[in-house]
Design a protein with these regions (language model features):
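Lumenal/extracellular "mature" regions of secretory-pathway glycan-modifying transferases
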Residues: 76-79, 92-98
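Conserved Lys-Pro-Asp/Glu-containing loop-to-beta segment of HAD-superfamily phosphomonoesterases
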Residues: 96-121, 126
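Alpha-helical substrate-recognition element adjacent to the catalytic core
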Residues: 3-5, 9-84, 88
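A short acidic, amphipathic alpha-helical/loop segment
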Residues: 44-51, 109, 125-129
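The start of beta-strands in P-loop NTPase/AAA+ ATPase cores
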Residues: 2-4, 112-113
């Protein structure tokens, strides 16, 4: 079965809605990653993901760290993102979590599957199925109907 990959920032996590998010990142603060609100109904998302896993799908996160910053900052960003997932989706057992450097080709990092990402260039370079965040629930439900 395929892996279903989710981007975090701007896809399921509201990083860009955090006031002054860019200033925080430029000053190597992880606050926006910690303060981001969920962008969809996580109770429904968690239920759908568990059902899909029960039918053989794997689920994963593929997300970039900040565009700039020290190696230590990138490590703190990765930690903050993992903590965010644990706090907001505690019932989800992720098959993979890949937090990679900004600009990394996500398809080459993951090797395919289904991608949900807010960045059009990531969807365009994905050589398999890819969708915008607003399609998450609809697509997950349609996958369940197919199994």
């Amino acid at each position: 079965m395929k892996t279903i990959w989710f981007d975090l920032d701007g896809c399921i996590a509201g990083l860009y809605a955090v006031e002054n998010w860019l200033d925080y990142l430029q000053n190597e603060s992880t606050y926006p990653y910690e303060a981001a609100k969920p962008l969809l109904n996580f109770s429904m998302l968690a239920k759908l993901l568990r059902k899909l896993q029960n039918h053989g799908y794997k689920i994963g996160i593929i997300s970039w760290t900040s565009k700039s910053g020290s190696e230590e900052y990138h490590n703190r960003v990765e930690y903050a993102k993992r903590q965010w997932l644990a706090r907001h989706l505690p019932s989800v057992v992720w098959d993979e979590i890949r937090i990679v450097r900004y600009g990394t080709n996500k398809y080459l990092s993951c090797g395919g599957g289904i991608l949900f990402d807010d960045e059009e260039r990531n969807r365009d370079s994905w050589e398999d199925e890819s969708y915008a965040p607003e399609d998450i629930i609809r697509i997950l439900k349609s996958l369940l109907e197919e199994v």
